[in-house]
């Protein structure tokens, strides 16, 4: 799964047409390495190049528009979920996707991977109202932590512990979503990236809270892409 953030202020339907059409090559060249680096750390340049190439060859204007329309619908559905922060993304094929971020402070107690009651309520609604309603969308789940050290552990051990915690939290979210509406084959990838890719300054408590998060990506499955190319995607 290769996903990048999009900074455009147009809806996914419009962006889908631009990305799927002839303009994709230029857009891909502009966003690939720079944004990919934010996602994948030191290997972001390679990831970004792949993303950039994908944006340039996405399956045509019509397919991009149809997929963008589906993503707009899913985005609105996700925006109705409590504690969910929703934004746009672009998948490895250059099609529009949706990124949903849940702060781990809402999902979990500090240092734990057991979902809180409030988290279960939000994720249950997300599973039933968004994932189950869009079975032709693939899902990728990525867990992160802040860089707080663990008591009694060395710096290296703390990094490893945070990595493991991020994996456990991502898996906890995946397991819950599958039990409450998401199909098992809908969730394509579940990974933890530990302390990497902070979105805020770890020097402040507020920044640490933002960095403790689980991101859920919704992106077009092969079946959705094929239907879009055939013009039959509803």
Model regions and ranges:
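Periplasmic OmpA-like peptidoglycan-binding domain that tethers envelope proteins to the cell wall
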Residues: 145-227, 232-234
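C-terminal motif of bacterial Sec signal peptides marking the signal peptidase cleavage site
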Residues: 3-7
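Extracytoplasmic/secreted envelope proteins and their assembly/folding machinery
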Residues: 32-35, 75, 79, 112, ...
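A short, charged
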Residues: 125-157
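Soluble non-cytosolic domains of exported or imported proteins
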Residues: 21, 25, 69, 109, ...
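Periplasmic peptidoglycan-binding/tethering modules of Gram-negative envelope proteins
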Residues: 50, 54, 62-138, 219-234
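Short, low-complexity, glycine-enriched hydrophobic/amphipathic alpha-helices that associate
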Residues: 9-79
